[in-house]
Amino acid sequence: MANSPQAKKRARQNEKRFAINKARRSRIRTFLRKVEEAIASGDKEAATAALRAAQPELMRGVTRGVYHKNTASRKISRLAARVKALG
């Protein structure tokens, strides 16, 4: 348990940031799930549109510190390859 005032404040800040980051991660995962579902259905147009919507969301997560840049790039790259393979 935090004893000093500074430690108590940091604990409060951590809880607040955890909740914010959790919401951001959830939002990004929703966008990624839409791409996955479009790929699974075999609809290339829907998958392309979903990927276009997911890319800026993922990169926004990088800017906000939710994801590492390489992680987001890897996710986008793999999804793009799968969408391209739908042909």
UniProtKB/Swiss-Prot annotation:
GO BP term, pick one: translation
Entry keyword set: Ribonucleoprotein, Ribosomal protein, RNA-binding, rRNA-binding
GO molecular function, one term: structural constituent of ribosome
One Pfam family matching this protein: Ribosomal_S20p
Region (Disordered): 1-22
GO-annotated cellular components: small ribosomal subunit
Coiled-coil spans in chain: none
Record has RNA-binding as a keyword: yes
Highest rank taxon of the organism: Bacteria
Keyword Ribonucleoprotein: yes
Function: Binds directly to 16S ribosomal RNA.
Similarity remark: Belongs to the bacterial ribosomal protein bS20 family.
Listed name of the protein: Small ribosomal subunit protein bS20
Species of the source: Ruegeria sp. (strain TM1040)
Lineage: Bacteria, Pseudomonadati, Pseudomonadota, Alphaproteobacteria, Rhodobacterales
